[in-house]
């Protein structure tokens, strides 16, 4: 009893006599008065190089589900609940981030209050997070930065755990399923660059432009911005009704002022969502999306880096971090001017596009054609060759290859829904779960084609199974993946290939993928006491053939006169059967007006 009291004396208190966070050397046993739990081996970050966090949005969601369930449990109602972690600096930082995020989302604490609680007690300082580059860390992202990013995302409606679909998030973030994430729901989708033909190359699944069409059309993606050199014909997107723009700059580098202006102009004049890609969809992609969010939502550089990495781990790398820090003041000024002119302009005089055309003092360029060819700017001859590594591949190539080595995640039992037969909002092509007998046979398919074992230079941290007691069916080979492969992985220029892609509920034909996968003004000094890191209503129909069912009637939430500044929700829904508190702070439905 004395030992137990001693542990709590040094613990961080989040709810008096109820919720604590502690760093312990040994694994404690729960007692009559205290319940201990840890997520150190359950929610594990998948690193690229020396990066180790923050944990992604799906893991934040799973943690909140877990903690809400414990706090609502009748058997634990009279006990103190202690989330404990070990002295491993990386695991400890991620554990602290999770309980801090919970405090911000559910306990209505400010990021500063939550961070202050983490610093209380006898806890040592926390290791800051870093980027996913190969070299030394030159930019520290603190836990406080991450909590502030969560708070900003919550305020602006970038996520809502009442409607978040964790299975969908984890499905589409995987390389074989498209490798994309929403950064601003209904506005920005970050994805890995398409290739001329869907195939597996050196163990890495590549997707043709056509593979993305059903999902893009279903979720109102109207424009595609390419930041890497041309490897597929833009005509393939434009012929399908999408606008396509080329804004090339070198892999791992920072964009010129001209590129930033043109990107902002495109985004401010585009109705609908914009899909942005470079090679891996991490560095260049995250940097330009960050510029827009800093301008229109007044995120600080640290807040937006944190938010984008929580949505899409590994984003914004090396000098790109410092670039955003330098650009923060000017982007804020541009945003203030933009909002001032938008506010003073009578709404009856025309649309936002007409207003934008008069903002000459903001140095926004003129209208761009649907297909913006870099030859006009003399930049088409630029290539990523300047930054190739000794083995002939670029930073983006390496990051994509590392990501492709990740093992499929087995979902924890608490994440499964009672309405598994319903289609996901991001993909209605998953009307059922495969039976255990089908799973058994699927495992034996041609998995040898995929390079799943980590390289000697960069070992991957594989996720461990999160199920603690219940037998959980494999998420990686459910029917959603089966059906979506017909769209995401079998689309090529070859007519025969197109014929073989199936949208049937009961099965799908064997493409290379189906065979494989059935198995402020002045930047503030950030001196914290640390050491040296979707609008989608769930579809109730169960037609599992494709990804392009019509969007739901949710868009009424968006304010019509500021559509480019408000995210809408077209896809992160979940069932009411989840273990979630229904007392989410009201700030989730409030927007901040600057």
UniProtKB/Swiss-Prot annotation:
**Annotated consequence of substituting residue 278 to S:** Loss of phosphatase activity
Keywords, A to Z? Cell cycle, Cell division, Cell projection, Cytoplasm, Cytoskeleton, Deafness, Disease variant, Hearing, Hydrolase, Non-syndromic deafness, Nucleus, Phosphoprotein, Protein phosphatase
Molecular-function GO terms, alphabetical: protein serine/threonine phosphatase activity; protein tyrosine phosphatase activity
Catalytically driven reaction(s): O-phospho-L-tyrosyl-[protein] + H2O = L-tyrosyl-[protein] + phosphate; O-phospho-L-seryl-[protein] + H2O = L-seryl-[protein] + phosphate; O-phospho-L-threonyl-[protein] + H2O = L-threonyl-[protein] + phosphate
Q: Which GO terms describe its cellular component?
A: centrosome; cytoplasm; cytosol; endoplasmic reticulum; kinociliary basal body; kinocilium; mitotic spindle; nucleolus
Instruction: Give the residues annotated as active site.
Output: 278
Where found in the cell? Nucleus; Cytoplasm, Cytoskeleton, Microtubule organizing center, Centrosome; Cytoplasm, Cytoskeleton, Spindle pole; Cytoplasm, Cytoskeleton, Spindle
The residue ranges flagged as biased composition, category Low complexity, are 532-549
User: Mostly located where?
Assistant: nucleus
Compositional bias ranges of the Polar residues kind: 404-413, 500-531
Tyrosine-protein phosphatase domain ranges (all copies): 179-336
Q: Quote the EC number.
A: 3.1.3.16, 3.1.3.48
Reading the lineage from the top rank, the first entry is Eukaryota
Instruction: Cite the residue spans of the region called A.
Output: 7-162
The outcome of changing residue 493 to Y is: In a colorectal cancer sample; somatic mutation
For the region Disordered, give the residue spans.
Answer: 396-435, 487-560
Biological processes annotated in GO:
cell division; cilium assembly; microtubule cytoskeleton organization; positive regulation of cytokinesis; regulation of exit from mitosis; sensory perception of sound
**List of residues that carry Phosphoserine:** 484, 583
Region of interest (B), ranges = 177-343
- One short Pfam name that applies is Tc-R-P
Q: Where is this region: Linker?
A: 163-176
Q: Which disease is it linked to?
A: Deafness, autosomal recessive, 32, with or without immotile sperm: A form of non-syndromic sensorineural hearing loss. Sensorineural deafness results from damage to the neural receptors of the inner ear, the nerve pathways to the brain, or the area of the brain that receives sound information. DFNB32 is characterized by prelingual, progressive, moderate to profound sensorineural deafness. Some affected men are infertile.
Q: How does it assemble?
A: Interacts with KIF20A, which is required to localize CDC14 to the midzone of the mitotic spindle.
Family indicated by similarity: Belongs to the protein-tyrosine phosphatase family. Non-receptor class CDC14 subfamily.
Domains as described in the record: Composed of two structurally equivalent A and B domains that adopt a dual specificity protein phosphatase (DSP) fold.
**What is the official name of this protein in its record?**
Dual specificity protein phosphatase CDC14A
Gene for this chain: CDC14A
């Amino acid at each position: 009893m004395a030992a137990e009291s001693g542990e709590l004396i040094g613990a961080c208190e989040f709810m008096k006599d109820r919720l604590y966070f502690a760093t312990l050397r040994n694994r404690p046993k729960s007692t009559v008065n205290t319940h201990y739990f840890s997520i150190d081996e359950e929610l594990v970050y998948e690193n690229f190089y020396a990066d180790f966090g923050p944990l992604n949005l799906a893991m934040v969601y799973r943690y909140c589900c877990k903690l809400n369930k414990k706090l609502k449990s009748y058997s634990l109602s009279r006990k103190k609940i202690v989330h404990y972690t070990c002295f491993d600096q990386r695991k400890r930082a991620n554990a602290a981030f999770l309980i801090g995020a919970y405090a911000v989302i559910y306990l209505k604490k400010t990021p500063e209050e939550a961070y202050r609680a983490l610093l209380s007690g006898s806890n040592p300082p926390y290791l800051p997070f870093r980027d996913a580059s190969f070299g030394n860390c030159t930019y520290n992202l603190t836990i406080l930065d991450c909590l502030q990013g969560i708070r900003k995302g919550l305020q602006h409606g970038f996520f809502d755990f009442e409607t978040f679909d964790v299975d969908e998030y984890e499905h589409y973030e995987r390389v074989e399923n498209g490798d994309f994430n929403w950064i601003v729901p209904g506005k920005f989708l970050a994805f890995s660059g398409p290739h001329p033909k869907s195939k597996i190359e050196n163990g890495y699944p590549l997707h043709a432009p056509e593979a993305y069409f059903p999902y893009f059309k279903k979720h109102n993606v109207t424009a595609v911005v390419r930041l890497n050199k041309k490897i597929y014909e833009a005509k393939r997107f434009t012929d399908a009704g999408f606008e396509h723009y080329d804004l090339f700059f070198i892999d791992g580098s920072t964009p010129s002022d001209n590129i930033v202006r043109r990107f902002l102009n495109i985004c401010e004049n585009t109705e609908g969502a914009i899909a942005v890609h470079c090679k891996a969809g991490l560095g260049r992609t995250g940097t330009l999306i960050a510029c827009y969010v800093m301008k229109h939502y007044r995120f600080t550089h640290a807040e937006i880096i944190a938010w984008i990495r929580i949505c899409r781990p590994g984003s914004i790398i090396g000098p790109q971090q410092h670039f955003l820090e330098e650009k923060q003041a000017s982007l804020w000024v541009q945003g203030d001017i933009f909002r001032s002119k938008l506010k003073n302009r009578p709404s009856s005089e025309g649309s936002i596009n007409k207003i934008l055309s008069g903002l000459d003092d903001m140095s926004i360029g003129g209208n761009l054609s649907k297909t913006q060819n870099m030859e006009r700017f003399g930049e088409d001859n630029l290539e990523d060759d300047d930054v190739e590594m000794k083995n002939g591949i670029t930073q983006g190539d390496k990051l994509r290859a590392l990501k492709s080595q990740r093992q499929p995640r087995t979902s924890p039992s608490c994440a499964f829904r009672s309405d598994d037969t319903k289609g996901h909002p991001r993909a209605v092509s998953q009307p059922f779960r495969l039976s255990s007998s089908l799973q058994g046979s699927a495992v034996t398919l041609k998995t040898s084609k995929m390079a799943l074992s980590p390289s000697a230079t960069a070992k991957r941290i594989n996720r461990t199974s999160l199920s603690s007691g219940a037998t959980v069916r494999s998420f990686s080979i459910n029917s959603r993946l089966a059906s979506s492969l017909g769209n995401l992985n079998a689309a090529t220029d070859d007519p025969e290939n197109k014929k073989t892609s199936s949208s049937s509920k009961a099965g799908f034909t064997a493409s290379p993928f189906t065979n494989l996968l059935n198995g402020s003004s002045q930047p503030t000094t950030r001196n914290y006491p640390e050491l040296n890191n979707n609008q989608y209503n769930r579809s109730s129909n169960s037609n599992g053939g494709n990804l392009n069912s019509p969007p739901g009637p949710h868009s009424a939430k968006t304010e019509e006169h500021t559509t480019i500044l408000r995210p809408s929700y077209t896809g992160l829904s979940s069932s009411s059967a989840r273990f979630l508190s229904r007392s989410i702070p009201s700030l989730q439905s409030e927007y901040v007006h600057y």
